[in-house]
Amino acid sequence: MTINPLTREICEIAHYLYSKGLTPGKSGNISARFQDTIAITPSGVSLGHVTEDEIVLLNMRGDVLAGGNNPSSELNLHLEVYKNKDVQGIVHTHSSYATGFAMSGKKIERLEGFGERTKPFLKMVNYAQPGTMELAQMVGEGLKEEDVIILENHGVVATGENLKEASLLAEFVEETAKIQFIARVLNNIEF
């Protein structure tokens, strides 16, 4: 894959995530790595409307190589994950159900599809201010042994061997959270 198809794929997946409600408004960000180049969505642009020419290309130090926009405010989060884990795609969403769990402090159970169920819940990292190096380092460390984590009071970060895999995992987390929310509500209602 070359950079041009990579920026096209980022836009396609960004539009898909937006259409599924995983990145409402101007929230969320995604990136993909090709060799030593990272392509990331810009800051302040809706993922539902982002265009290829708005995608920012950077090196692994975070130096901008191409693109007229500022990179996502969560650039350091993406860089830390790439430094700590051999993945090619990262998706950060603010989807309703998963973020609801993150804000309530309630954990999302691991269901089939999350690999071995040696751990009963998805990992949640403690709250840190969005866009900070503190959050970036916590996420980088938290994803060393996981493919997806929940950010307390914030959202979800999913990784994958490619961007499509990361986006499908983020979507699966949201559906899992939705199912668990519905089940918990129904368990407390008498018919």
Question: Each predicted region: which residue ranges?
Answer:
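Glycine-rich flexible loops
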Residues: 1-191
